[in-house]
């Protein structure tokens, strides 16, 4: 892709985000698009948001679950930026007007207590850098019509980011085997998605290690205070107006969210 084409792709995604009207897959509009192009497009819109006063508070890792990879037809993780205005409190109601074809994923949030700026951080170094973990719900969204995405589409679209909710009781990850934690996501008390830490690259810690190494290689190391969302521990679930979701992760805790009952982007009440 030419620099102008990258700008055009970024603008089309941004307009879709603002209008709530999804667009055709970028891979169809720009057949020569590759992964480097996709991350460049993501970066253009990240800088656009920063210029408008938004602040990057961390990173999200996507496509870490084999189940989710199968759902979307991809075979490797990706990452996107988390902004300060994406955060909602535990049990807070989320307005539907800001969402784009939303789906819920149960994850683990890692908050760093120190920088991870070595070139190839080890698992132990990453674990020691984590201040605490919390259960998290990520409400992913797509600006691509009907979630018709391949890897380059979701990467360009900030890893299909939306908003997120963190649990209110932080705990230390040291002494926890995060590969063994079980997860149950319920809609109004009925289980709709189950999984375990092992579904996330073998353990959510592996996902954070992957991200730390990737960001160091890109010259953008993870910093103290940043939030890292691990990626899904089980299948994602489509949101309906008025839904109430609660996630429980054994040994980590619970987190809850609910959605407005009126119409939202891409879904009719």
Curated annotation (Swiss-Prot):
Key words of the record: Aromatic hydrocarbons catabolism, Lyase
Cofactor(s) listed in the protein's UniProt record: a divalent metal cation
Signal peptide: none
Associated pathway: Aromatic compound metabolism; 3-phenylpropanoate degradation
HAMAP family (UniProt xref): MhpD
Family from the record: Belongs to the hydratase/decarboxylase family. MhpD subfamily.
Protein name (database record): 2-keto-4-pentenoate hydratase
Naturally occurring in which organism (per UniProt): Paraburkholderia xenovorans (strain LB400)
Gene: mhpD
């Amino acid at each position: 892709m030419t620099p102008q084409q990258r700008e055009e792709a970024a603008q089309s995604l941004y307009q879709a985000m603002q209008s709530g009207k999804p667009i055709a897959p970028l891979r169809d509009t720009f057949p020569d698009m590759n992964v480097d192009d996709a991350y460049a497009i993501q970066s253009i819109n990240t800088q656009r948001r920063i210029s408008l006063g938004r602040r990057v508070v961390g990173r999200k890792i996507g496509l870490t679950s084999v189940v989710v990879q199968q759902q979307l037809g991809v075979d490797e993780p990706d990452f996107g930026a988390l902004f300060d205005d994406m955060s909602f409190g535990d049990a807070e109601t989320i307005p539907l007007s800001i969402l784009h074809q939303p789906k819920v994923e149960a994850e683990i949030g890692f908050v760093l207590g120190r920088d991870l700026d070595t070139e190839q951080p080890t698992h132990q170094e990453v674990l020691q850098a984590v201040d605490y973990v919390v259960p998290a719900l990520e409400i992913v969204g797509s600006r691509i019509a009907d979630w018709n995405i391949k890897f380059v589409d979701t990467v360009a679209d900030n890893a299909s980011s939306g908003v997120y909710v963190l649990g209110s009781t932080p705990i230390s990850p040291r002494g926890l085997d995060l590969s063994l934690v079980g997860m149950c996501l319920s809609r109004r008390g009925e289980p709709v998605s189950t999984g375990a830490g092992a579904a996330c690259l073998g353990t959510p810690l592996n996902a954070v290690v992957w991200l730390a190494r990737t960001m160091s290689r890109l010259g953008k190391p993870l910093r103290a205070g940043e939030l890292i969302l691990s990626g899904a521990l089980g299948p994602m679930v489509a949101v309906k107006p008025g839904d109430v979701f609660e996630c429980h992760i054994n040994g980590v805790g619970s987190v809850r969210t609910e959605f407005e009952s009126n119409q939202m982007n891409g879904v009719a009440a």
